[in-house]
From Swiss-Prot:
The gene is PB1. RNA-dependent RNA polymerase which is responsible for replication and transcription of virus RNA segments. The transcription of viral mRNAs occurs by a unique mechanism called cap-snatching. 5' methylated caps of cellular mRNAs are cleaved after 10-13 nucleotides by PA. In turn, these short capped RNAs are used as primers by PB1 for transcription of viral mRNAs. During virus replication, PB1 initiates RNA synthesis and copy vRNA into complementary RNA (cRNA) which in turn serves as a template for the production of more vRNAs. The lineage of its organism: Viruses, Riboviria, Orthornavirae, Negarnaviricota, Polyploviricotina. It comes from Influenza A virus (strain A/Dunedin/4/1973 H3N2). This is RNA-directed RNA polymerase catalytic subunit. The keyword Phosphoprotein applies. Belongs to the influenza viruses polymerase PB1 family.
Length: 757
């Protein structure tokens, strides 16, 4: 069925149609090549915004650093990072005055979290800069490598698995005169193949020990690796994002925990909540301003945009905020929270892979690694690149650039929100002491400002005062990109408010369609997305029904599984026809086996296998759900799985869907080509870690435990658990005496092996 899209708009109010103007269909743009240029842009811009600050040299690393704090008062209309420390502290004090006890209580909550968090918190997250290998790794591997190096250097606090103990190790590691690390390298040699008698190149992976002096180690520990941010819509230029290493991550986590706890208590904060809860919070603030503006006052709203939020923030500012927020707390707690901002004010940015050069004439391609940029002759570069390199040279060392000011994307979202809210908080009449007043919403760098005043001059004065107050703490509201409207119509974090929030449906468009995991998961995710959008995004019944039909069409096209009696000829349709002819109850066939679609908008919550179970032929049931069927090679599947869906905007969201194991929930095999590269050793470490954890989960099926990290403790825990379980099973008569004694023997053998090792 082909659909005429204009039908969608017959009864749609104009403001709801805004979503169709968004650039959110089709594939988002991805970056190719290196991010070196983008990173240099970031470093140069950040220094430019703070250029009137003071230059100093870091005594430990010898790196040049720029400190703009308490620099010249900024001019109107120029973006700058010259935050005034006393202004920031005063904003914090007023925030505390308006919310008595807020910092105290948040500190207590955070202290509890600090005591309880295990080091495996750090295994969450994707790519992490691995300082031992000087490149990105999955978080779990990077953590395991760091702990392994710490242990071989005599640091053992982390055996117990508490994050705070791991952080003690990090602090101690920075005092060591040198660290010994293990790096992977590969050797190539030519050998004669016995079978073919040809010469072949054989690669072997070696591990070698390397000593790093204090200064080099500090530089590595303070390094953020950079990558290009992918899939950003609506932008012409790409930009760089940072991945910090394991030394920084734990400290950042605790700072953000404290800031999150504060944000939860602030009505103007758009973080950490999301979705419908966020909309309710925002609607409250708007309601408050509109009721108060009665008939005597005007109320206007600015849909705000800040210029280069991250590059004008300053870690030294965050240090001042932390010092104030934790002012009456125990010393150890204050120290732990001050380390992240201190590390950030001494950070180094890795420039990435470097530049690719091509000579069309000589058919040559060569890569200039970032390490060479400090010394290479600039005549090879075009003018814009030449300027970039000249500017960054004084800051370069071994392919990293010293970057003291600025925050890099996405590191302190919660804490910077607290700073933004503290300025919104100053808009109360008791602080403005005049006829205008303001309030608003802040979510990381995005804000909406609502100003009330008796007349237009008052509104203008209020906006000016807000603008200048922001300047004092290093927030630069962009006059070009912010616009003002009568209160009742504005946009905030891509929510459009028009006397209530309008569903911006186009944001969800990219998540409709076939995910490409496997036949079973794709069907389940597809219908769940439609169901969720009916609940949350005003997807009406008629449109949902149409979305469902389009999804089924897309699904059949993807898996080449048109109905069994179709005329479409593909390699697969031949088999599906045979299946169709020999099936008695054709309604019971999965859509992916050429069956009919039985979904409609009333039964989207039921997995397909349950929906059709009663209609299936018995032998079909047996094939689909028989654990002995060699094709059912799936993991033990819980009743709920998580899919990653990409909304058009913001981070990928995790969405739960029902997972029922059948022959169709296969797992594709991984590409094994990695085995011939130097990554092989790393991959094996990662798999070993995974295997240990899986084994451990078999022993402790309750969901209450947290993964331990010290391998020694894992083995001991499993052995003692095995002994207890065996005794209980033996006494209850579930296992025979021989089995019981065999288990005991195995346990003793394991312990014996550990002792010998």
């Amino acid at each position: 069925m082909d659909v005429n899209p204009t039908l969608l708009f017959l009864k749609v109010p104009a403001q709801n149609a805004i979503s169709t103007t968004f650039p959110y269909t089709g594939d988002p743009p991805y970056s190719h090549g290196t991010g070196t240029g983008y990173t240099m842009d970031t470093v140069n811009r950040t220094h430019q915004y703070s250029e009137k600050g003071k230059w100093t040299t870091n005594t430990e690393t010898g790196e040049p650093q720029l400190n703009p704090i308490d620099g010249p008062l900024p001019e109107d209309n120029e973006q700058s990072g010259y935050a005034q420390q006393d202004c920031v502290l005063e904003a914090m004090a007023f925030l505390e005055e308006s919310h008595p006890g807020i910092f105290e209580n948040s500190c207590l909550e955070t202290m509890e979290v600090v005591q309880q968090t295990r080091v495996d918190r750090l295994t969450q997250g994707r790519q992490t800069y691995d300082w031992t290998l000087n490149r990105n790794q999955p978080a779990a591997t990077a953590l395991a490598n760091t702990i392994e190096v710490f242990r071989s250097n005599g640091l053992t606090a982390n055996e117990s698995g508490r994050l705070i103990d791991f952080l003690k190790d990090v602090m101690e590691s920075m005092d060591k005169e040198e660290m010994e690390i293990t790096t992977h390298f590969q050797r190539k040699r030519r050998v004669r193949d016995n079978m073919t008698k040809k010469m072949v190149t054989q690669r072997t992976i070696g591990k070698k020990k390397q000593r790093v002096n204090k200064r080099s180690y500090l530089i590595r520990a303070l390094t953020l690796n950079t990558m290009t941010k992918d899939a950003e819509r609506g932008k012409l230029k790409r930009r760089a994002i940072a991945t910090p290493g394991m030394q920084i991550r734990g400290f950042v986590y605790f700072v953000e925990t404290l800031a999150r706890s504060i944000c939860e208590k602030l009505e103007q904060s758009g973080l950490p909540v999301g979705g419908n809860e966020k909309k309710a919070k925002l609607a409250n603030v708007v309601r408050k301003m509109m009721t108060n503006s009665q008939d005597t006052e005007l109320s206007f709203t600015i849909t705000g945009d800040n210029t280069k939020w991250n590059e004008n923030q300053n870690p030294r500012m965050f240090l001042a905020m932390m010092t104030y927020i934790t002012k009456n707390q125990p010393e150890w707690f204050r120290n732990i929270l001050s380390i992240a901002p201190i590390m950030f004010s001494n950070k180094m940015a890795r420039l990435g892979k470097g530049y690719m050069f091509e000579s069309k004439r000589m058919k040559l391609r060569t890569q200039i690694p970032a390490e060479m940029l400090a010394s290479i002759d600039l005549k090879y570069f075009n003018e814009s690149t030449r300027k970039k390199i000249e500017k960054i040279r004084p800051l370069l060392r071994d392919g990293t650039a010293s970057l003291s000011p600025g925050m890099m994307m996405g590191m302190f979202n919660m804490l910077s929100t607290v700073l933004g809210v503290s300025i919104l908080n100053l808009g109360q009449k008791k602080y403005t002491k005049t006829t205008y007043w303001w309030d608003g919403l802040q979510s990381s760098d995005d804000f909406a400002l609502i100003v009330n005043a008796p007349n237009h001059e008052g509104i203008q004065a209020g906006v000016d005062r807000f603008y200048r107050t922001c300047k004092l703490v290093g927030i630069n509201m962009s006059k070009k990109k912010s616009y003002i409207n009568r209160t009742g119509t504005f946009e905030f974090t891509s929510f459009f408010y028009r006397y209530g929030f309008v569903a911006n449906f186009s944001m969800e468009l990219p998540s409709f369609g076939v995910s490409g995991i496997n036949e079973s998961a794709d069907m389940s995710i597809g219908v769940t997305v439609i169901k969720n959008n009916m609940i949350n995004n005003d997807l009406g019944p008629a449109t949902a029904q149409m979305a469902l039909q389009l999804f089924i069409k897309d699904y059949r096209y993807t898996y080449r599984c048109h109905r069994g009696h179709t005329q479409i000829q593909t390699r697969r349709s031949f088999e599906l026809k045979k299946l169709w002819e020999q099936t008695r109850s054709k309604a019971g066939l999965f859509v992916s086996d050429g069956g009919p679609n039985l979904y409609n908008i009333r039964n989207l919550h039921i997995p397909e296998v349950c929906l059709k179970w009663e209609l299936m032929d018995e032998d079909y049931q047996g094939r689909l759900c028989n654990p002995l069927n060699p094709f059912v090679s799936h993991k033990e599947i819980e009743s709920v799985n998580n899919a990653v869906v990409m909304p058009a905007h913001g981070p990928a969201k995790s969405m739960e869907y029902d997972a029922v194991a059948t022959t169709h929930s296969w797992i594709p095999k991984r590409n094994r080509s990695i085995l011939n590269t130097s990554q092989r050793g790393i991959l094996e470490d990662g798999q070993m870690y995974q295997k240990c954890c899986n084994l451990f989960e078999k022993f402790f099926p309750s969901s209450s435990y947290r993964r331990p990290v010290g391998i020694s403790s894992m083995v001991e825990a499993m052995v003692s658990r095995a002994r207890i379980d065996a005794r209980i099973d033996f006494e209850a008569g579930r296992i025979k005496k021989e089995e019981f004694s065999e288990i005991m023997k195995i346990c003793s053998t394991i312990e014996e092996l550990r002792r010998q090792k």
